[in-house]
Amino acid sequence: MSNNIQQLQEELAKLVARNADFEGTQTTKIPSLSISCHTKPHYSNGIIEPYKISKPSIYIVVQGIKEVTVGEEHFGYGSPYYMVASMDLPIIAEVHEASRLKPNLSIKLEFAHSSILELLSGDELMMKVKKKSQRSLNVAKLDESMLDALARLVRLLDKPKDIPILSQIYTKEILYKVLHGEHGEALRQIVTDGSPAVYIQKAVQYIVEHYKDAFSVELIADVAKMSVPSLYRHFKEITAMSPIQFQKQLRLQEARRLLIDEPLDVGEVASRVGYESPTQFIREYSRMFGFSPRKDVKRIKGLDQV
């Protein structure tokens, strides 16, 4: 890592720490920018449903490492890498190591679909439909130019009068670099006419809105206006899951949130998220999180009291 990259990384960590008013994730004066500060181990269990990625975004850990699980895939990322996310995904993001002396600090920057289209308009090569869909969640290496643009954006938190104009300029610059970067195709494909990702987005949106309900894969294929084989192939390529696995992840992560945040018993939670059988719910919950519902809640609440 070059000295300049390390200096920018350290500056970003100081900026995030200084502007973090409380533990956890918070919005900032820049509408598209949010920051996170964790001084203790953290599991996806907040009231704001942290398992949903609602807009195309990038995530940068400026101090520490975050562990991410999507489907059956698991990876960690930190400096000098960033994560690119293009659509709603049921993910688990965890911080295993953090302290008051060295908190885990991160940045999230969201992009509007219209901004992606604006930067791609007129570029026929960039808008060309690719035969193979790209995964909607990827990790890419940060270079000095992107870190510099991020630092300029985050510095605006100390200069609120400059935010209305300069934040838009810097955000567009960062988006341009992402689009032309290693995994820019993940964002390009969601706004490209005829791209399978455009149709998969419709399927994803339907499942997110109806995950508590029973549905057939044929219905999801009809929503996406795709054949069943095509839906299966592209859904798996983009989300790392089948439609039914995607639904199951949403159900179980919402169940985890309910168990932690509300005084409900396991049977009631199972019913709330769409399970008819509490036994099946407990079995699938244990398989996904590694603990039974009760043990998992006790473990997480114990961590919160550290």
Residue ranges and their predicted role:
Residues 1-31, 47-48, 132-134:
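A short, N-terminal "cap"/entry segment at the start of jelly-roll beta-barrel domains
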Residues 298-306:
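Generic C-terminal helix-cap and adjacent flexible tail
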Residues 50, 158-164, 186-190:
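Hydrophobic/aromatic-rich alpha-helical bundle segments in the mid-to-C-terminal region
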Residues 173, 177-183, 192, 208-210, ...:
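Basic/polar phosphate-binding segments, predominantly the helix-turn-helix DNA-binding elements
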Residues 140-155, 168-171, 175, 179, ...:
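A short, Lys/Arg-enriched amphipathic alpha-helix from helix-turn-helix/homeodomain DNA-binding modules
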Residues 75, 161-169, 218:
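Short, solvent-exposed positions on alpha-helices
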Residues 121-148:
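Aromatic/histidine-rich interaction motifs
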Residues 27-128:
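N-terminal regulatory/effector-sensing and dimerization cores
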